[in-house]
Amino acid sequence: MAQPSFFKQGPSSTLAEIAALTKAELVDASRADHRITGVASLDEAGPMHLGFFENIKYAGQLAQTRAGAVLVSPRFEASVPPHVAVLRAKSPFRAFVAYARLIHQDAMRPQSGFDLTGIAASAVIHPTARLEDGVTVDPLAVIGPQVEIGAGSVIGSGAVLSPGVRIGRDCNVGAGTVIQFALIGNNVLIHPGCQIGQDGYGFIFAETHQKVPQTGRVIIQNDVEIGAGTTIDRGSLRDTVIGEGSKIDNQVQIGHNVTIGRHCLIAAQCGLAGSLTLGDNVALGAKVGINNHLHIGDGAQVTAMSAVKDDVPANGRWGGYFAKPTKQWFREILAVERLPKSGAPGADSKDAKGERQG
C-alpha cells in the first residue's frame, strides 16, 4: 500500500527561485536550474528535497544526506557533501520555513475535516444564531442561541458554541471543542478538544467548600493560537484575557482572571493559577507552574519545569524549583555538585583499605 500524503504538494522551484525567496546565496551558480519539489529532514531527504542544517548535533546527518540542496550558515558551509547544492543563509531555519510556508500553505491552518464548504446537514444551528457568508460548519457541530460567527471561519465536527459566544472572522474551532461565555477575535486557531469558558476553580475553603460564582468571560484577541486539549477558565469577577498574537501549546491550563499579554509563548502542560498577569512577549517552557496573583514582566523567560512563587521582573531569565534568576540557580546547582561525595556527617565511609569506619 502506498504511503498516504495528507498535504498537497506545491509547485516545484529552481534553486535560483528559492535563493531569491529566502534571501540566501546559491554558492554554485551552475546549479541554479536544479528543481526542488519539497522539503525534508536531512536523514530523509532525496535529490528533489531542500533541507537545512543549523544544529551541530545533526552533523552526522549532514555528512550523509542525499538532499538536493541544503540551507546552511557560512560557519558550516564546508561540511556540506560535494553532491549537495549549498544555499548560504544567515538563518538557515528561518529561510527553510519561508520556503516550506510557500509550498505547504494548506498546512498553515486547519480546514474542514470533511472538505466541506457551507453548513453540514447534521449540524445543529439555533435560529437566532448569526453566521456571516462563507462560514463552514462540519457535521454534528452545535451552534447555540445568539451565537455570532464571522466570515471565513470553520467550526469543526462535534464542536459546541454555547449561547452568546462570538467568533470573529477567519477563525478555526477544532473538532470536539466546547466554548462558552467567550468573545473571540479574528484569525484565531483553536485546535481540537479545547475547553474554553468553563467555571474557574473558586471556592471558600470552609467545611462545605462553598462555590464562588464565576461571572466573568474569556476574551481571546486577534491572531491567537491555542493547542489541542488546552483549558481556559472564565473569570470570576474580571475577564480572563489572552492577548493578541500569543501562541499556546497543547494541554495548558489557564485559571480564572488570568491576563496574558501580547505575543506570549506558552509551551505544553504549563499551569497558570488564577489572577496572575503575564506581560507582553513572555516565554514559558514546558510544564512551568505559576502561583496565583503574581506578575511576570514583559519579555521574561522561564525555563521548563520551573515552579514560580514570586513575581518575575521584566526581561528576567528565571528557572528552578522554586524559580529564581537563572544565574543564581546555576551557581547553586554547581555548589551542590561540588559537595563531598563521601565523608559527610552521618554518611557511611570506608578507609583506604576499604574497611567500614565507625
From Swiss-Prot:
It comes from the Bacteria. One of its GO terms (cellular component) is membrane. InterPro entries: Hexapep (IPR001451), Hexapep_transf_CS (IPR018357), LpxD (IPR007691), Trimer_LpxA-like_sf (IPR011004), UDP_GlcNAc_AcTrfase_non-rep (IPR020573). CDD domains: LbH_LpxD. Its EC number is 2.3.1.191. It catalyses: a UDP-3-O-[(3R)-3-hydroxyacyl]-alpha-D-glucosamine + a (3R)-hydroxyacyl-[ACP] = a UDP-2-N,3-O-bis[(3R)-3-hydroxyacyl]-alpha-D-glucosamine + holo-[ACP] + H(+). It holds the Pfam family LpxD. Catalyzes the N-acylation of UDP-3-O-acylglucosamine using 3-hydroxyacyl-ACP as the acyl donor. Is involved in the biosynthesis of lipid A, a phosphorylated glycolipid that anchors the lipopolysaccharide to the outer membrane of the cell. Homotrimer. This is UDP-3-O-acylglucosamine N-acyltransferase 1. It comes from Rhodopseudomonas palustris (strain BisB18).
